[in-house]
């Protein structure tokens, strides 16, 4: 492997007891063990009273106010730059007047991708409140748990999602997928009734016309609570500040976009096929890209054929995606469903959120040879800021997740000695920079996750001599299913309540279609005839579809440390599960 060659080179010339080592590269300090970005620093706003929405709209170009900023891929219904400013301001006023939303209030967004998502998200922030997002396919139990943990005072949900809502203390307002600023957009009297509350808020909330007081909010106030599996254990609420998201906008989105402007790229048109409820999609399509005046073409749900058609129709130039979407595009091309003329406008495809195989990268480059392909790395805890791929005439390192973003620093820490490691050596990746979260909603394990401002990612990685980062494994237990994060503890909490299950541990297995799938190792109670199918059906009724257990292995005992901690690595690394299992079964990751 490349890192082995680097390490071997360091030991060259060791004869006669003399060790000759090359000087460290300029981006690495041997004295401190810290890696720095090779990009020039980016100046970030210092005004402590600045908010994210104010920053975005100050950055949004004033020229051409009628230019589309959000476009519904299916209908071509658009929100212009001027519309965006007006709709966010009026909806924020409606939230304050109609529902008493104020500084510190938490509003839960249970919404699918739509042009209404960014407007709703930014309006919550403009009202002085905190937004917390959820995948709209979440189960009633998951919705109730997050609403309770965050103290949500209001829920914004889609019409389809309303059917899954459990009884909640907070009121629910249904949000349409299309915004053309009038009730006439709704289909018939029933739609007008269903969305009447939202339309009333969108008109500013009515009242006597007196503006409610706008809360005083600053950079260090919370702006979002996004859920992540963290570095281990159960899902945790990640508290992000206005400062975090402003840094993300500048260091991730605007900086990367500037690289393509510098190359003389045409007007940027981005396809939003990633869920905006996740930090990857949220940071791009509901926040950062809106500040540069790009057009965001929103797919309500991904379909490879529809995506190809939308690329051709809207002349899409950039397509951020995750490995399963990338694989679907490759399959569509192999089946002859991607005419070259339809994707000729595509300049860049970026991939993140989950590991990707070298084979899939090769297949993609064969199918789309004109596209600049890069990978990136970030976490919810780093507000998606970490590294971004950067191809040059000299370097095209497609399997790397790229270079450190501006203003970011990293360490590679030895797993046993905790010493810092130079390029070519693998260890745990630690990150430091302005995107690092304020903390978890519950600070129970914050100290072990952050140390002196450093975020311990739980990922095993190394830097090469050019400053490119490679992820080679991980310490943490998170399962990445089609780009979605699944905390094993969440599934174990569901399974252990089954009356016929004595003990359980959930880990991951590699899967060609999904990247990874959840695998449940189950110890049945004495006399139980519980089947694999029954276990999977039990879980499926209580979690979002992407969280379903895809394989069940019945075992006699769960391996644990003397302290009682489940040794997931033994389960994950065991290639001969049949030797330990009494029986097993699985379902397709395509379901």
Curated annotation (Swiss-Prot):
Organism: Oryza sativa subsp. japonica
One Pfam family in the UniProt entry: AMP-binding_C
EC number, as in UniProt: 6.2.1.12
Residues engaged in binding ATP: 228-232, 236, 375-376, 380, 459, 474, 565
InterPro entries according to UniProt: AMP-bd_C, AMP-bd_C_sf, AMP-binding_CS, AMP-dep_synth/lig_dom, ANL_N_sf
Binding site for (E)-4-coumaroyl-AMP: 280, 353, 375-376, 380, 476, 480
Official protein name in the record: 4-coumarate--CoA ligase-like 3
Cofactor(s) in the UniProt record: Mg(2+)
EC supergroup of this enzyme: ligase
Molecular functions (GO terms): 4-coumarate-CoA ligase activity; ATP binding; CoA-ligase activity; trans-cinnamate-CoA ligase activity
One BP term from GO: phenylpropanoid metabolic process
Annotated region described as SBD1, given as residue ranges: 303-375
Keywords: ATP-binding, Ligase, Magnesium, Nucleotide-binding
Domains as described in the record: Both substrate-binding domains (SBD1 and SBD2) are involved in the substrate recognition, and are sufficient to confer the substrate specificity.
PROSITE patterns: AMP_BINDING
